[in-house]
Amino acid sequence: MKIIEGSKYAPGKKFAIVISRFNDFIGSSLLAGAIDELKRTGGVSDDDITVVYVPGAVELPLAAKRIAAKKQYDAIIALGVVIRGGTPHFDLVAGESNKGLAQVSLEYDIPVAFGVLTTESIEQAIERAGTKMGNKGGEAALGALEMVNVLDKI
């Protein structure tokens, strides 16, 4: 039996981080977590990390698609914060963002790590951006690091 696994060490690989500006007071912590994991765990240099800001989570898939089409990056990390309000807007934004990012990954054969928080409250978002529940931005970066190496081995 052959087992294929990827390490989380990927010096020389190039990563694009696409981040939504909406709810930036939380998103900035996700970004810091992602960059920290890429550099500390992945051995990725600053020169191999590009950060692209977009207005909101709905714009993440289009920016990711444009980045993927350029074929200059080994993985994309999508970050954002969508907090449920009193309208169905949350479900539309969260669902379309997730679906669009998955489509980019499959269409362009590139890992697109989903680090978009979809929470019921601001408190839950804060907990997942570096406090009680860890940093989901950092976790998305770890997933991107591992997938880059897994795909290299397949």
Curated annotation (Swiss-Prot):
Q: In which pathway does it act?
A: Cofactor biosynthesis; riboflavin biosynthesis; riboflavin from 2-hydroxy-3-oxobutyl phosphate and 5-amino-6-(D-ribitylamino)uracil: step 1/2
Task: Enumerate the active-site residues.
Answer: H89 (proton donor)
- Could you tell me the keywords of this UniProt record? Riboflavin biosynthesis, Transferase
Q: Which sites bind (2S)-2-hydroxy-3-oxobutyl phosphate?
A: G86, T87, R128
Q: Which SUPFAM superfamilies match?
A: Lumazine synthase
Say if the entry is tagged with keyword Transferase: yes
Q: Which GO terms describe its cellular component?
A: cytosol; riboflavin synthase complex
Gene Ontology MF terms = 6,7-dimethyl-8-ribityllumazine synthase activity
Q: Which GO terms describe its biological process?
A: riboflavin biosynthetic process
Residues holding 5-amino-6-(D-ribitylamino)uracil: F22, A57, V58, E59, V81, V82, I83, F114
Catalytic activity, reaction form:
(2S)-2-hydroxy-3-oxobutyl phosphate + 5-amino-6-(D-ribitylamino)uracil = 6,7-dimethyl-8-(1-D-ribityl)lumazine + phosphate + 2 H2O + H(+)
Show the InterPro entries listed in the entry: LS (IPR034964), LS/RS (IPR002180), LS/RS_sf (IPR036467)
Query: Which Pfam family, an example, fits this chain?
Result: DMRL_synthase
Q: Which domain of life is it from?
A: Bacteria
Q: What is its EC number?
A: 2.5.1.78
Say if the entry is tagged with keyword Transferase. yes
- NCBIfam families from the UniProt entry: lumazine-synth, PRK00061.1-4
Q: Which HAMAP family match?
A: Lumazine_synth (MF_00178)
How the protein assembles, per its UniProt entry?
Answer: Forms an icosahedral capsid composed of 60 subunits, arranged as a dodecamer of pentamers.
Q: Which family does it belong to?
A: Belongs to the DMRL synthase family.
**What does this protein's UniProt record list under function?**
Catalyzes the formation of 6,7-dimethyl-8-ribityllumazine by condensation of 5-amino-6-(D-ribitylamino)uracil with 3,4-dihydroxy-2-butanone 4-phosphate. This is the penultimate step in the biosynthesis of riboflavin.
- Name by which UniProt lists this protein: 6,7-dimethyl-8-ribityllumazine synthase
